[in-house]
A protein has these predicted regions:
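Membrane-proximal intracellular helices of multi-pass ion channels
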Residues: 1-480
Length: 480
């Protein structure tokens, strides 16, 4: 392990976070929240000083392999979460350090699960920071760093591969740094467009900004106790549309910018993604029709919740925990499906389910006709065995972590649905689950131990498991 270069990269992260903390400080200044302003300025200063101390370490070698990439990624997300939790503790918004860490990790991983029973009494600076963590984490913290800094040659690709939450689009342009800038350009543009649509619907500037942050990062922190239930149908439809748009592979948007419309529309994953959404909306709309006054109202709530869950955003337009069993079962299944690979959404991803389906079809064909060669193809391209193997290993690790987490959080004594959906909601970065962790409830009743388990799940889910598991391997920490 090249410790020096890992620590050097972490110093850049601390510098970036120090700068980003100035934005909620500005919000506190605008609203006259002087104590909160002081806390954000102090936290920013501490982050900058820590960054300066780490930056003094000079790497003797520029060697940067995948293990450095995995270690940097996992440590980076842990570090920004620790620093990001400080304002919650010092302002008294969440005095318990474990609870503050849970809230911050939930923000950066764009999970949106909260321990707070109510948020409307929080200072505006804290509300801004909660939602802004979604926007920072949505594309990936290290992708943001790569868009700003010319790092060592090997670190570009290995960081991009190790940090899975952002789009994997290193083939768009030759330079990885240029790719990162393109990604953030698209990300920023979509955020601004949504912000303008929300303003046009009568939402105030502050609320529009927080909504755009949460939607863009596919995070679910609300700034109202009932999430989006009290907003107009227009606002709910705008949020629905943009949640779904941010769940699309960003490759498609880049192709649209290049006017390669046919190629963008030919993506099997994107087509499957929209097909799943349409099917789920249709089933749920029919199932909940009797609960609402009109078909249009039922359709709106069904579309909102399907878009929210499959993209792993986690906003709610109603208490879907009160829906019929079939509707809730569909939503739970969507928790595992997730959004497209290369989007800001979480979950297992549509592409992996497509690959599993195609691999199953291949195995069935060869079971019936052993001599038949049945290659697996995605978008017309042959899928190599290494990709299939990696997918299988990911699923095995996912099942193991899910089962272990489910058993551990069950020690708190909650019912099975609560425990199952709490793990599903955190490992898939959804936010709300059912029963005691439903859309109008929170995770505050869990013990500190259970919260730590769920914190691990949120990080593992956002980083697609491997970077977090690498931290527990002794071989990864051996020096050269």
């Amino acid at each position: 392990m090249n410790y020096a270069i890992v620590l050097r990269l972490l110093s850049y992260i601390l510098y970036c976070e120090a700068a980003l903390l100035l934005l909620p400080a500005m919000a506190s200044l605008i609203y006259g929240e002087w104590m909160v302003l002081g806390v954000f300025l102090l936290t920013a200063a501490l982050s900058a000083v820590a960054g300066a101390l780490l930056h003094r370490i000079k790497p003797k070698s520029q060697i940067f392999y995948m293990r450095e990439g995995f270690a940097t990624t996992a440590l980076c997300w842990l570090l920004i979460s620790v620093v990001g939790a400080v304002p919650f503790v010092l302002t008294g918004s969440i005095p318990n350090p474990v609870g503050a860490m849970f809230e911050t990790v939930s923000g950066f991983t764009t999970t949106g699960a909260s321990i707070l029973p109510g948020v409307e009494g929080l200072p505006n600076g804290i509300l801004f920071w909660r939602s802004f963590t979604h926007w920072i984490g949505g594309m990936g913290v290290l992708v943001f760093l790569l868009s700003l800094l010319p790092l060592t040659g090997g670190s570009h690709v290995n960081l991009m591969k190790a940090e899975s939450p952002g789009p994997q689009v290193d083939k768009l342009v030759p330079k990885v740094q240029s790719t990162a800038k393109i990604l953030y350009g698209i990300y920023f543009a979509l955020t601004v467009v949504e912000f303008c649509f929300l303003l046009a619907g009568g939402m105030n500037v502050f609320d529009s900004l927080l909504t755009a942050f949460g939607t863009a990062g596919t995070g679910g922190f609300g700034f109202k106790n009932d999430s989006f239930a009290s907003f107009s149908p227009y606002i709910q439809w705008v949020v629905t549309i943009f949640m779904i748009l941010f769940g699309v592979n960003f490759n498609a948007y880049f192709l649209l910018l290049l006017r390669r419309f046919r190629r963008a529309a030919s993506s099997e994953e994107v087509r499957a993604y929209f097909a799943i959404i349409l099917a789920a909306v249709a089933v749920i709309t029919v199932n909940i029709r009797s609960l609402y006054g009109t078909f249009g109202e039922a359709l709106r709530h069904a579309a909102f919740q399907v878009g929210s869950i499959i993209t792993t955003t986690g906003f709610s337009s109603c208490d879907f925990d009160l829906w019929p069993t079939l509707a809730k079962e569909v939503l739970v299944l969507l928790m595992f499906v997730g959004a497209c690979a290369g989007s800001t959404g979480g979950g297992i991803k549509v592409s992996r389910f497509l690959l599993m389906g195609k691999t199953l079809g291949k195995e069935l064909k060869q079971a019936l006709h052993p001599q038949v060669v049945a290659p697996v193809r995605m978008d017309g391209k042959l899928v190599n065995h290494e990709t299939i193997r990696t997918t299988n290993v990911f699923l095995a690790a996912y099942i193991f972590i899910f089962a272990a987490s489910f058993m551990l959080v069950s020690l708190d004594g909650f019912d099975m649905v609560t425990n199952f959906t709490s793990v599903a909601a955190t490992l898939n970065n959804i936010g709300p689950g059912l029963n005691q962790v439903g859309p109008m409830m929170n995770f505050g009743a869990y013990s500190n131990f259970a919260k730590l388990v769920l914190i691990f799940d949120m990080l593992a889910g956002r980083l697609e498991i491997f970077p977090m598991l690498v931290l527990f391997l002794p071989d990864a920490w051996r020096r050269f």
